[in-house]
């Protein structure tokens, strides 16, 4: 069948930002025509302090994107890891968004309909995690991989990520380059989405093009799974606290589909959780197969 280019079920950035304002930052007050005070990420309830660190990881087995203008370089992924940490007095709190101007550009040019007075404040949101803090080396912790929604960001579910880490998990998230709203690489280069659209969200694309795009997402996860086993190449201390035998995955909307699909075909993933997952493109034959691992979906009845 023919698949729409913009998944339903809260998959575009407008709905992600609405989720951000109404759920992730639950204490926000949105008042039309008045200044809205956006609060910091909610305090965590677990026992562990949280460190976070960003990495550029390159997959030399794939091109950056399938379009001619973008397939000349290897696939680049910005990856962020959150982990239980030993925080020192010189460590600095991390921000929810590092590049406010790129976020403002994305919201404005993609027609997400979020008032500028709100979007301009997102860059000032502070998190509970500390940038580049030293990992807590006294234990090993289960690993969770996070996949964002269509046009989303790796940090979009920071509230849940930090809460999980505070209870003893390592969380690995990546921006799915050219499907994320934007990606800022370590050198400051910004890559904007090539799939999110403003007035063309209902444009119909072929199933072949859809699955070509989707394969970039699932192969991103597969590549990260491989790199987790070689993470000493990036940070040996973080690698040492990852329990590689206990890996789960979760995602929002399109990321929920990405998570479920990847979990079916990778034995390394022991469990899967989807937040309002968008499952329409998933083949019925796959859904009907015997599921031999915990698979959980939190969403609306008859949606997605």
Regions found by a protein language model. Give the residues of each.
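Domain-level recognition of soluble alpha/beta enzyme cores
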Residues: 31-144
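Active-site machinery of serine-nucleophile hydrolases
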Residues: 85-90, 95-117, 155-202
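Gly/Ala-rich beta-loop-alpha elbow adjacent to hydrolase catalytic centers
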Residues: 149, 250-255, 259
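Alpha/beta-hydrolase active-site loop
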Residues: 178-244
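C-terminal motif of bacterial Sec signal peptides marking the signal peptidase cleavage site
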Residues: 25-27
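The feature captures the conserved acid-bearing segment of alpha/beta-hydrolase catalytic domains
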Residues: 270-304
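Short substrate-entry loop that stabilizes the transition state in hydrolases
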Residues: 125-184, 281, 303
